[in-house]
């Protein structure tokens, strides 16, 4: 399973925000420069993360973005579920005539559950725990 670039940058953004000292905020420009992504794409990512209440966005001169809740409470699987279309294949009878007898869809469903279970076992905070190399790379913003 491959995550969309949208989800990839959303996860990277959450990791970066979690690396900041408590209550410190950053801005979209810093995030776009850190990850080398277009500002337009990052604005969409930030807006969606704000809509989902993962981050707090503040407009204006002293505005910025920061996590809206502790990183230890944000599970990677939760973020992926919120952002990804998780239907691996289209198994509707209109699309595939073998659907009524197909055993693949059940295997794919179980594989998706296993994938998400693994991601549910990891919080954004855990990705930073004892990871000095990552913290150094994130400070380049």
Curated annotation (Swiss-Prot):
Pfam families: Rrf2. SUPFAM superfamilies: Winged helix' DNA-binding domain. GO terms for biological process: negative regulation of DNA-templated transcription. GO terms for cellular component: cytosol. Binds 1 [2Fe-2S] cluster per subunit. Its cofactor is [2Fe-2S] cluster. The lineage of its organism: Bacteria, Pseudomonadati, Pseudomonadota, Gammaproteobacteria, Vibrionales. Keywords: 2Fe-2S, DNA-binding, Iron, Iron-sulfur, Metal-binding, Repressor, Transcription, Transcription regulation. InterPro entries: Tscrpt_reg_Rrf2 (IPR000944), Tscrpt_rep_HTH_NsrR (IPR023761), WH-like_DNA-bd_sf (IPR036388), WH_DNA-bd_sf (IPR036390). Nitric oxide-sensitive repressor of genes involved in protecting the cell against nitrosative stress. May require iron for activity. This is HTH-type transcriptional repressor NsrR. The gene is nsrR. Residues 2-129 form the HTH rrf2-type domain. GO terms for molecular function: 2 iron, 2 sulfur cluster binding; DNA-binding transcription factor activity; double-stranded DNA binding; iron ion binding. Residues 28-51 bind DNA. [2Fe-2S] cluster binds at residues 91, 96, 102.
């Amino acid at each position: 399973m491959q995550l969309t670039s949208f989800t990839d940058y959303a996860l990277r953004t959450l990791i970066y925000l979690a690396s900041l000292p408590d209550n410190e905020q950053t801005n979209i420009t810093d995030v776009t420069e850190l990850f080398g992504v277009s500002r337009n794409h990052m604005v969409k990512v930030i807006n969606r993360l704000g809509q989902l209440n993962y981050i707090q966005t503040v407009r204006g001169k002293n505005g910025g973005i920061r996590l809206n809740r502790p990183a230890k409470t944000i599970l990677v699987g939760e973020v992926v579920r919120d952002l990804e279309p998780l239907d691996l294949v289209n198994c509707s009878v209109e699309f595939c005539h073998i659907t009524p007898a197909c055993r693949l869809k059940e295997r794919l469903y179980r594989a998706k559950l296993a994938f998400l279970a693994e991601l549910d076992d990891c919080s954004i905070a855990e990705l930073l725990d004892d990871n000095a190399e990552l913290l150094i790379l994130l400070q380049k913003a």
